[in-house]
Design a protein with these regions (language model features):
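Active-site pre-lysine segment of PLP-dependent enzymes
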Residues: 1-14, 18-47
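PLP-dependent aminotransferase class I/II
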Residues: 37-108
């Protein structure tokens, strides 16, 4: 986290890939409020097992989010991927239970 804080002090956009955040328990999301140049990327590929659907999201300052929405392509997410992501969110507890089991096995 210290490295990200140092980078976020620069006059540049800083993008952090948190694809494995659910497995590590570490996130820089709390830094976004202080550093509006910080963008965090998350995916449903790992914790929810949706790798083939290529769906994820970003977390950023509202101004950055507005800019990204203005330039995104229409229909950039398939209906199937969107439905699967919504189901993963609704049943997040099930997915996170699996993550916790994997983490316990890793630490064993």
């Amino acid at each position: 986290m210290e490295e990200v804080t140092e980078l976020a002090e620069l006059d540049a956009m800083i993008v952090v890939d948190e694809a494995y955040a659910e497995f590590s328990g570490v996130s820089v999301i709390p830094l976004i409020e202080k550093y509006p140049n910080l963008i965090v990327l998350r995916t449903f590929s790992k914790w929810a097992g949706l790798a083939g659907l290529r769906i994820g999201y970003s977390i950023s300052h509202s101004e950055i989010a507005k800019r990204m929405m203005a330039i995104k392509q229409p229909y950039n997410v398939s209906t199937i991927a969107e439905a699967a992501a919504c189901a993963a969110i609704r049943h997040r507890d099930v997915g996170l239970r699996s993550v916790n089991l994997l983490v316990l096995e890793r630490e064993r």
